[in-house]
Amino acid sequence: MRICLVLEGCYPYVHGGVSTWMHGYIQAMPEHEFVLWVIGAHAADRGKFVYELPGNVAEVHEVFLDDALRLSGEQQEVDFNDREREALRRLVSLSNPDWDVLFDIFQRRRVHPLSFLQSRAFMDIFRDVCLAEYPYTPFADAFHTMRSMLLPVLYLLGSEVPVADVYHAISTGYGGLLACLGSSVHHAPVLLTEHGIYTREREEEIIRADWVVPSFKDRWIRFFYLLSEEIYRRAFRVTSLFHNARKTQIDMGCDADKCLVIPNGIQFDRFKDIPLKPDDGWVDIGAVVRLAPIKDVKTMIYAFFELHERLPRVRLHIMGGVDDEEYGAECHALVDTLGVRDLIFTGRVNVVEYMEKLDFTILTSISEGQPLSVLESLAARRPCVTTEVGCCPELLEGAPGDDFGVAGFVSPPMYRKGLADAMERMCASRARRIEMGERGQRRVATYFLHEQMLANYRALYDETARAFDLPREGE
């Protein structure tokens, strides 16, 4: 089967949990041919892959959002029929447009995005929306907000569409929209896998963002919900990593009958025999994390600073690359400003080898799905302290029916004292750490094996092939 994986902002450009998962996933399915349709932010990253692509990746199609800002060329006068005008009106007003009509306008008719945005039709629609929703907002603010919202979408709708039997999106958002476009153009089924709930993550970012005009924050949030609604509607199956995520998808409008839970899985044998660190009088804490705002490394630094004031013989090892250069510099500056001792930025390391130096691990993310770093830590019998996000409580405390026991502590996000208290409790007893680590290892061995995950996805592809009369393995 020829499967188009649609990815946004991750593989193969950056390291991280989703990228690691994706690389291993492709390698483990040599029976399928994969096409990567990848969305990046900056065209300067074209071809700059940090992974050596597996041999069963047949093609890579790269699309960069900042290319939309450089659109030029002679604009043509465009006319739209009543059906097209209605679809465009609903797009601008964020009210359930007919996406197949929009795909036809920008794919088959090849209408240039700027031709629409500079057309009388757009200005008429835009005026009506502003009068209805933003009568007291400056015209310039409304126009630039609308343009910056629509231009990337219209640009993506005109993208070259790779041919595939199935379009498998690894998020909603822009990636989900491209998967729907591929489905429409080539009459192929769509699958969706969400590691986190993309729309909720964008909502959190927009609420905190300084670049969004306050009166338009609600519109930006509605925009991302609009994108998710289409792939939830069109997808044959929608997978999530844990039960609460599935519930969120259903609450956001996805048909419950198409929603499946397929947990992450790790290569357990790589971690299960890593020896525990000898008791040397120090407690070593590890954080396998990229330096990125969503990982909230600053709160981790503050919490460790407070812990070190209470317990001098503790060390923190932050293991990961820099995802955001500005944020990375701010993290290093914070360490210097506070005068934090015994904190080591290791950069990217071989986690299996480095795990021998650690007593337990910590994760302070603002948002997560089902973090591989926590699964790997538990597989290596290292308990964890995490924020109460995503699947972390289930991983450490167990889901319904899981009686293995507590394998770590959770704290609310961005609560440095709570994290410091949890780390102090973990530091207090080596015997408790060992017991928790063994519980966590048994949980991973039972529920989170790589082989189980792959079997579930193979079954999903097989079900899709049967339902849509597609080529199947061995045919």
Regions found by a protein language model. Give the residues of each.
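Short hydrophobic beta-strand element within catalytic cores of glycosyltransferases
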Residues: P383-T386, G390-E397
